[in-house]
Design a protein with these regions (language model features):
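Structured binding/interaction patches within domain cores
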Residues: 1-131
């Protein structure tokens, strides 16, 4: 689970600027470390989940794509520090939420939905595995 968290944190750090929530940042900082305790995981997981819930309420009835992007970044951070259960894939879950964040950002900026997030995620994974 430690390697899953480390890769997930690297992937989500690419989209973190869409959130800028200190609780999300704390979750990513903890997930990026190999030496995290269960107590640390519990604290940052709860904080990241609170950020996720709050970001969802900020999205509003009229879709604000930038707020939606921030919500997906928070969901990605929650995946980074979530409980590792049999069959779970923390890095995959975080990567999918990061892709959703990037898609929302491109819609918000009028760039459409084309982006290279998946390619960048594979590059990050390859770099991690080669170290």
């Amino acid at each position: 689970a430690s390697q899953q968290r480390q890769v997930a944190a690297r992937i989500v750090q690419r989209v973190f600027p869409m959130s800028n929530d200190v609780r999300v940042k704390a979750a990513l900082d903890v997930a990026a470390r190999a030496d995290i305790s269960d107590a640390e995981l519990t604290v940052v997981s709860q904080a990241a989940n609170t950020a996720r819930v709050e970001s969802f309420t900020q999205c509003g009835k009229e879709t604000d794509w930038s707020a939606q992007a921030g919500h997906f970044v928070a969901k990605a951070a929650v995946a980074c520090v979530g409980a590792a259960t049999p069959g779970s894939n923390l890095a995959w879950d975080a990567a999918m939420q990061a892709r959703m964040a990037r898609t929302c950002e491109t819609v918000a900026t009028g760039e459409g939905t084309e982006n290279r997030e998946a390619e960048e995620q594979y590059r990050i994974l390859e770099a991690f595995l080669n170290n």
